[in-house]
Amino acid sequence: MLTPPRTVVRRDGGLYALERALQRRGFRQVAGADEAGRGACAGPLVAAAAILPPGRRGEVDGLADSKLLTPASRERVYAEVIARASAYAVVVIPAAEVDLRGLHVCNLAAMRRALASLATPPEYVLTDGFGVDGLDVPGLAVWKGDRVAACVAAASVLAKVTRDRIMVELDLEFPGYGFAEHKGYITAEHSAALRERGPCPEHRFSYVNVATVSGRQGAPPRARRPLVAEADEAMERAGVVKGTVGVALGERPWAGASVGNDVAMEGGMG
């Protein structure tokens, strides 16, 4: 990220204070980026970016960190974010790609791709927790950004709802693991199912708990192993697949999609 200008915001200023302070400094298009699924041992990693319009048009009733909302509240807020956002993008990285590239590399690449896919180019970027390099606009990594910046909270909800819907679909495809309940995170139920059934193709074989029960020393099934590991820079050169709004509606992303050919949806009020 480029070095951001100095901006002072009151800690108790509310969810929209940081964006409004930046907008007063002349940054009208402030994008937030966040992810869902970093800590899960099954299912995809999902990153999202969102720009909310300035003023009252960008205020989303009930918007908060997705982890603080009930599933019903998340669905309602998700629909309102989609309706109000000036631009939004969601990128889905399959478990196989997380195993191949590594979690942190995929996480940064996914957020970078989501930001680059916004129909409205951002003038300033806020990210949750850590910075994303390779951006040509100033930005700021905000600790618990999904609780202090509205655009980051909006991205958090987009990523979380998209991923949860995918996990419900995976539960139908791979019954017995409880994906619809725990969404691929480590729980007592999930751990018991792993021990009893072994991992399925949607598990992340690079994770210790999955590798331990797989009996394959962490190697994924042959059907999931790519013949050639392409160079990381290919992830950045390849274009984003456009128009796959179905991902947000619960449809499965295309099998085997990589970071370089990721599944994305785009939209916004324009």
UniProtKB/Swiss-Prot annotation:
A divalent metal cation binds at residues 34-35, 128. One of its GO terms (molecular function) is manganese ion binding. GO terms for cellular component: cytoplasm; ribonuclease H2 complex. SUPFAM superfamilies: Ribonuclease H-like. InterPro entries: RNase_HII, RNase_HII/HIII, RNase_HII/HIII_dom, RNaseH-like_sf, RNaseH_sf. It is found in: Cytoplasm. Its EC number is 3.1.26.4. It catalyses: Endonucleolytic cleavage to 5'-phosphomonoester. Residues 28-222 form the RNase H type-2 domain. Its cofactor is Mn(2+); Mg(2+). One of its GO terms (biological process) is mismatch repair. Endonuclease that specifically degrades the RNA of RNA-DNA hybrids. Belongs to the RNase HII family. PANTHER family: RIBONUCLEASE H2 SUBUNIT A, RIBONUCLEASE HII. This is Ribonuclease HII.
